[in-house]
Amino acid sequence: MAVPKKRTSRSKTNSRFANWLNKSNLQAQRAISKAKSITNKKNTVNDETIETE
């Protein structure tokens, strides 16, 4: 028989959203850092070789 599930608390929802937001901000910072590194024509980014033309 179908039984409704318990509702997720607001604090748990907020905690999960904050965790997701922090992860996305970290990824954005890394992307910006790589872009800056490439525009400054450095040869390596995080031990990866980037070929510049």
UniProtKB/Swiss-Prot annotation:
GO molecular function, one term: structural constituent of ribosome
SUPFAM superfamilies in the record: Zn-binding ribosomal proteins (SSF57829)
Compartments where located: Plastid, Chloroplast
Cellular component, GO, one term: large ribosomal subunit
InterPro entries recorded: Ribosomal_bL32 (IPR002677), Ribosomal_zn-bd (IPR011332)
Keyword Membrane in annotation: no
Keywords: Chloroplast, Plastid, Ribonucleoprotein, Ribosomal protein
GO annotation, biological process: translation
Keyword Plastid: yes
Family recorded in the similarity comment: Belongs to the bacterial ribosomal protein bL32 family.
Protein name (record): Large ribosomal subunit protein bL32c
Upper classification of the organism: Eukaryota, Cryptophyceae, Pyrenomonadales, Geminigeraceae, Guillardia
Primary gene name: rpl32
